[in-house]
Swiss-Prot record:
Protein name: ATP synthase subunit a, chloroplastic
Function, in words: Key component of the proton channel; it plays a direct role in the translocation of protons across the membrane.
Keyword field: ATP synthesis, CF(0), Chloroplast, Hydrogen ion transport, Ion transport, Membrane, Plastid, Thylakoid, Transmembrane, Transmembrane helix, Transport
Origin organism lineage: Eukaryota, Haptista, Haptophyta, Prymnesiophyceae, Coccolithales
Keyword Transmembrane helix attributed: yes
Record-linked NCBIfam families: ATP_synt_6_or_A
SUPFAM superfamilies: F1F0 ATP synthase subunit A (SSF81336)
Length: 233
């Protein structure tokens, strides 16, 4: 049993060399699959638009309304519309990626090195998503207020300058590590339980993982929208 537990690996990757750089091949494979699923849904939902939506169109319109509600609540009624595509893209990518990691037994597919898993299982993916949020935060603030945006760093007093600067650095860090840690921990727990008790015990944990995956997509997109709303206040 203890030798089986040693088969649960963390941090091993299938490396590809692209343009002289080493990239995590298994992350790219599942990322392309996530993008293909989202693109397929978008095409199927817009092929034949109907006045009374049904099927995939109805599902996509429900997702759009849900994401629009998140953006409107966090960014504000007068500024949220241009940011709906960004918030929606974050939500859909993380949601689909997390669900793929929670539902599909990737360990059944053997690679020369490493293991297939959700892209959000890799810290590079979550950091990249967080950096996009951080860039959007500064872009929104600078676009709305110009150079006056930077006055927030010395508000209410210049003494808070280092604290305010540090706060902007910790935002992407907290976003990335929260998502990465939750998804990685869930997949490790499921892997260990599958090795110990392969049949019944892992099922409740997998259901909990599916729920947690959905919550993480909501938390990440909501906080991203909240940061953008904060920058344009």
């Amino acid at each position: 049993m203890f030798f089986s537990l040693a088969a649960v690996e963390v941090g091993t990757h299938l490396y590809w060399e692209i343009g002289g750089l080493e990239v995590h091949g298994q992350v790219l494979l599942i990322t392309w699959l996530v993008l293909a699923i989202i693109l397929t849904l978008a095409i199927l939902g817009t092929l034949k638009l109907e006045q009374v939506p049904k099927g995939v169109q109805n599902f996509l319109e429900s997702v759009f309304e849900y994401v629009s509600g998140i953006a409107k609540d966090q960014i504000g009624e007068y500024h949220y519309r241009p940011w709906v595509p960004f918030v929606g893209t974050l939500f859909l990518f993380i949601f689909v990626a997390n669900w793929l990691g929670a539902l599909i037994p990737w360990k059944l597919i053997h690679l020369p090195e490493g293991e297939l898993a959700a892209p959000t299982n890799d810290i590079n993916t979550t950091v990249a998503l967080s950096l996009l949020t951080s860039i959007s935060y500064f872009y929104a603030g600078f676009k709305e207020k110009g150079l006056g945006f930077f006055a927030r760093y010395i508000s209410p007093t210049p003494i808070f300058l280092p604290i305010n600067i540090l706060e902007d650095f910790t935002k992407p860090l907290s976003l990335s590590f929260r998502l990465f840690g939750n998804i990685l921990a869930d997949e490790i727990v499921v892997s260990v339980l599958c090795l110990l008790v392969p049949l019944l015990i892992p099922l409740p944990v997998m259901v909990l993982g599916i729920f947690a995956s959905s919550v993480q997509a909501l938390v990440f997109s909501t906080l991203s929208a909240a940061y953008i709303g904060e920058s344009i206040e």
